């Protein structure tokens, strides 16, 4: 029995394992339940009982050596057959780093500011969280005006008094603050975010950017207003842009008008964006209402002025032929990278 164990140990030590097939052959020959080592274990019952423990220990040691040989060979084969670590090709270009740029809304707003700055306007700003008196009362809004309803306005505190606190629905309150703080002549633009409780769609959003303008001086007429808007539109949209003024109504201006430009998609022929009219509205405007001037302590018998307001986001849609305003708020890099610095 001892000679059989010694002979099998030498055979195991000399067995060459260099492939998965050879490893499997080794396992089947020596370590499985019907292998040679298991066969020797089955012969223990014929060994002298006095020597049986000694022979049993020798077989256990042989079995452990064979199993260790299997594990060692398996690890060695795994290392040699695993894919090689990828090498770095130093001649290849590195990963591209994209240069940051202005958001299209900020880009267009900057252009608008520059155009009006060249006309002599200065920039004025104010709080986005506004008092109801500045947002409505001083701008000649009647108490029952629909804009005061919660369906149109985000109220932070509402008790039906001048102390209502809300997210401003336009940047006109900045004009009120300017008229209260400065003496005429006044020539300012008021850019900023505004908030309205509107359904989100391709053409409207609950938060957007607005730019309003105010000019007060002696002898200001509607002709001055039209000249300013014509000059702005041609610099912003191109010298061939067509404009039209439509009579309208705003509580804070009289007379009032809405300004349209030819549709950027169809060129005035009619499409779904312009609702087959060929025109797109870009702003509202008019002569400052005498009541607004009186509320700010300015004598309308001496001074006159005009005001206008437009959505910056809508101007972005017009300028870059974007058909969905929601794209401006989704932070989709595929869209934003189309507007390089």
Swiss-Prot record:
Provide the species name: Chlorobium luteolum (strain DSM 273 / BCRC 81028 / 2530) (Pelodictyon luteolum)
Question: Would you name any one GO CC term?
Answer: cytoplasm
Q: How does it assemble?
A: Tetramer of two alpha and two beta subunits.
The protein's enzyme class:
ligase
Keywords of the record = Aminoacyl-tRNA synthetase, ATP-binding, Cytoplasm, Ligase, Magnesium, Metal-binding, Nucleotide-binding, Protein biosynthesis
Kindly list the cofactors needed.
Mg(2+)
Compartments where located? Cytoplasm
Cofactor stoichiometry and binding remark: Binds 2 magnesium ions per tetramer.
Among InterPro entries, the record links this protein to: aa-tRNA-synth_II (IPR006195), aa-tRNA-synth_II/BPL/LPL (IPR045864), Phe-tRNA-synth_IIc_asu (IPR004529), Phe-tRNA_ligase_II_N (IPR004188), Phe_tRNA_ligase_alpha1_bac (IPR022911), Phenylalanyl-tRNA_Synthase (IPR002319), tRNA-bd_arm (IPR010978)
Q: Which gene encodes it?
A: pheS
Provide the primary localization: cytoplasm
Q: Which family does it belong to?
A: Belongs to the class-II aminoacyl-tRNA synthetase family. Phe-tRNA synthetase alpha subunit type 1 subfamily.
Q: Which reaction is this enzyme known to catalyze?
A: tRNA(Phe) + L-phenylalanine + ATP = L-phenylalanyl-tRNA(Phe) + AMP + diphosphate + H(+)
Put simply, this protein is called Phenylalanine--tRNA ligase alpha subunit
| MF term (GO), any | tRNA binding
CDD domains linked to this entry: PheRS_alpha_core
Q: What is its EC number?
A: 6.1.1.20
A Pfam family per the record: tRNA-synt_2d
């Amino acid at each position: 029995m001892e000679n059989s164990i010694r002979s099998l140990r030498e055979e195991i030590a000399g067995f060459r394992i260099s492939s998965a097939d050879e490893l499997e052959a080794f396992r089947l020959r020596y370590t499985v339940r019907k292998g040679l080592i298991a066969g020797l274990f089955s012969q223990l019952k014929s060994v002298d009982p006095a020597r049986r423990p000694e022979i049993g220990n020798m077989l256990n040691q042989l079995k452990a050596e064979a199993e260790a040989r299997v594990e060692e060979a398996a690890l060695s084969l795994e290392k040699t057959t695993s894919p090689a670590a990828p090498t770095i090709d130093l001649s290849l270009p590195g990963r591209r780093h994209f240069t940051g740029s202005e958001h299209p809304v900020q880009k267009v707003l900057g252009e608008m500011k520059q155009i009006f700055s060249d006309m002599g306007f200065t920039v004025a700003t104010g709080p986005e969280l506004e008092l109801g008196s500045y947002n409505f009362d001083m701008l000649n809004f009647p108490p029952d005006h629909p804009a005061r309803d919660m369906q149109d306005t985000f109220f932070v505190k509402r008790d039906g008094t001048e102390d209502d606190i809300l997210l401003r629905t336009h940047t006109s309150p900045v004009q009120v603050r300017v008229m209260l703080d400065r003496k005429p002549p006044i020539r300012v633009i008021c850019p900023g975010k505004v908030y309205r409780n509107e359904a989100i769609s391709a053409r409207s959003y609950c938060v957007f950017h607005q730019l309003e303008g105010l000019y007060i001086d002696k002898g200001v007429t509607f002709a001055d207003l039209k000249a300013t808007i014509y000059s702005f539109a041609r610099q912003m949209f191109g010298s061939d842009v067509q404009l039209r003024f439509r009579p309208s109504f705003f509580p804070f201006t009289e007379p009032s008008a809405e300004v349209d430009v030819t549709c950027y998609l169809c060129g005035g022929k009619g499409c779904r964006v312009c609702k087959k009219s060929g025109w797109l509205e870009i702003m509202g405007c008019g002569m400052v209402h005498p009541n607004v001037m009186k509320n700010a302590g300015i004598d309308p018998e001496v001074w006159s002025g005009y005001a206008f307001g437009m959505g910056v986001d809508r101007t972005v849609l017009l300028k870059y032929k974007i058909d969905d305003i929601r794209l401006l708020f989704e932070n989709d890099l595929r869209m934003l990278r189309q507007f390089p610095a």
